[in-house]
Amino acid sequence: MRLKMFLLLALMLAVPAMAQRTGIKGIVVDSKTGVPVHGATVMLDGQGASATSTLDGSFVITDATAGSDVVLVFSYGYKDWSQDVVIESNRIVDVGTIRLTSTRSYDNAEFALTESQIEDEEGNSQTIATLTGATDNVFYQAASYDFSLMRFRIRGYDSEYTQTTINGVTMNDAARGRFNYSMLGGLNQAFKNKSIGMGLEATAYSFGDVGGANNIATYAKDYAPGTRASVAYTNGNYYLRGMITHATGLNKHGWALTASAAVRYSDQGIVPGSFYNSASLFLSLQKVFNPQHSLSLTAFGAPTSRAANTATYQEIYDILDNNLYNPSWGWQDGKKRNAKVVEAFDPTAIINWIWTPNDRLSLNTGVAVSKSFYSSSALNWYKSADPRPDYYRYLPSYYEDQDVKDLYTHKWLTDESFSQINWDALYQANYLNNLQAQETGEERGSTYILERRHSNQLNTSLNSTLNLRLNDYMTLQAGISARFSQASYYKTIKDLLGGRYWKDIDQFSERDYPNDYTLLQNDMNNPDRKVGKDDRFGYDYNINSIYATAWLQNVINLNHWDINYGLTMSYTQYQRDGKMRNGRSPENSYGKGEMHKFDNAGIKAGATYKIDGRNSISAHAYYGTKAPLFDKAYISPRIKDDAIADLQSERILSGDISYNFNYRRFHGTITGFWTDMYNQTERTSFYDDQFSTFMNYVLSGVKKTYKGVEVGLAYRLTPSITINAAGTFSRYQYKNRPTGTRSYENGQAPDTTQVVYLKNYYVGGTPQQAYSLGIKWNAPGMWFLELNGVYMADSYVSLSPVRHEAMPGLYKVCETEEELIQKTAEITRQERLNDNFVLNASIGKLIYLNRTASLNINLNVDNVLNNRNIQTSGYQQGRFDYTNFSTSKYPNKYYYAQGIKLYLNIGVKF
């Protein structure tokens, strides 16, 4: 297999050169940021010959007639550009770098990344930051901002299917395969130079993935010299953001420096009990030795602490008439204290050596080291009542007696020690344990604690990317990369809540097997261990992984055709290394486990037929395999080394076709796409009532289909007024009956497998319909106004596999076959979330203070109509009532968006 792939790669290198022709070539970039402008139309006015700029901004016209002509360049969002040119026979004339001036009178790099990017713990967000010069695709601009409110995912893909690089170095994490936007820390000015490869498009910096590829450039010499500062107010998860950036530009000694800092703060966010504290630093230093060699250093980090909210039941939202109710906090000493606090810090350093021996060859080699610290706190308890206020036994609906229902409803409405976490009661329970220990001499530890669940990573990455222009219309692009990663997972004690210690045993095993001393031990190497603040307990293991890949592609730009084709191959290995000998799996938990190895490959091709200078049709296709992420490969990694049986690589088949047009006043793209994914894995954990223990559940062999249509249109009514329309109608569905594996953490039963009936159910967590209609006005006096109406629909709750297994006992509670059918439909029903309409508005003013200084004022008002019923996501619980098969005992849980949201930014540049 590897030999065949190498031979294919070698064949791609042996592409014959073609005859020289007559024409022009050049590069189109944004005049302010220097970012390449992709999709700009370049025409020779007197001949009608044309070309479209590629992802790196380059273009070439090769069938021109010698003589004098005028080069015209136009692209949506930019002023038209023209210049006289003299074309020489049998020569491709280089017109150099064409700098287009943006028609946007505001700097949208000042706006924050969407909260779905910054704060999505599950890593499902795949929206794209709207950064200057990133893309002129109207649909992708709408998806990046307008649709993000309901956690819209482009084409339905999870973020692991989008590859993100910084200066060409891959930054997707090893465990979940995603790029973590929160590591950027809101440093929008520092990370504003972004190139986007949409879908299956070819890019110059990586092979990409089915969800596309993004590259963020942070080379110090590319930042405009000067200082930029801004302060912003918002009523979201934080209310204050300050940011300052200074760039020296490239001085006469070949040095360039850019530094940036930002803070985000809130002692009380829009969600009760939440807070947000983040400080960010960025440094980019570059030395240009000569036109051929330069060295760049980029370093950044953003230590962040934030209090999170938790999804809960619709019943509680309705009782309190508050869809932002948060069960994760309670009062302590007159202050709000949140039990779910996330702490994250991802310090990163990247070094790049750029070698450009001539104008046809460039080699970018980068090394990155990053250390990711991530933890989330949670309550834990031992032989005591559940302290969470939204525990199902505390709901009025749990009781049948109406008087009891009314009593619980009254307590929810009037008593915050009941409707929120009662911290005083938790401390009191532990104080009583201390008192009893003093009186009786019997050892008694904490009944309640606050624990911290850690998932850290140390990543070292190496990337090298080659761009070689073989001739005026053919470019060879290739790259190699390797990543070495160690992921560490463990728990520590954050707070004993007044108690003396915590006993490190499994309480479920102790309850079910009190006489089996071995079974209840979390670490047989340190049995019955008493742990205190900051001690590790419960579980402790590493996963060491290596990922290496090589890719190569050819890009051919002809007068009427743009063609690209490429191959990639990769090698993945990972291995669990347990630091505790767990009593439920004493022979398969401690030390290094089985090594899992995967060889994978992929091939993709694309072609664009340019009907004329303004209309084109493009198509892309991809087939490849991808190693399963180790975050989903292990069944119960906290307990043992067991992975999914017959673990296989994922297979992906994808294609799309687009019609593109780019007239001076009318611009747009219509795309149809289709993707099949085979052998996917999914993993979830929950408390299982049937066996009264914590359950790990893995789905394997999952097949999903993603298909739909995307439309993005922009019409310029006048030079200053533009109407935008964007939308998608899609279907994301499960297409088979995968295998489910249950693993019981108390060791009560061996792992079991069963068929899970998911075929034709929807992939949850994202709208499958989304539409926007907006108008932009760049008004006189450097004012701008924008109004957008957004409608999103067809979003479904995420499925729980236990509701889609065979239930042999179901017939016992059904008296007739008709009742059995109805009950089955009720259990397996997938709820559709609310459809929603949102109106967003923005206004801004740009004021030039003098020739070098300007003041920028922007006000965004999202959800102008104050719609408070927007369900951003929801999920079926893993817990299920196997006694009465009642769906109301453990109903779905939901997250809601806030109502009206303001974002006021004032920035100055000098």
Where are these regions (language model features)?
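Signature of Gram-negative outer-membrane beta-barrel scaffolds
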Residues: 449, 475-612, 637, 739
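Outer-membrane beta-barrel signature, preferentially recognizing the C-terminal barrel domain
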Residues: 324-348, 352, 543, 593-602, ...
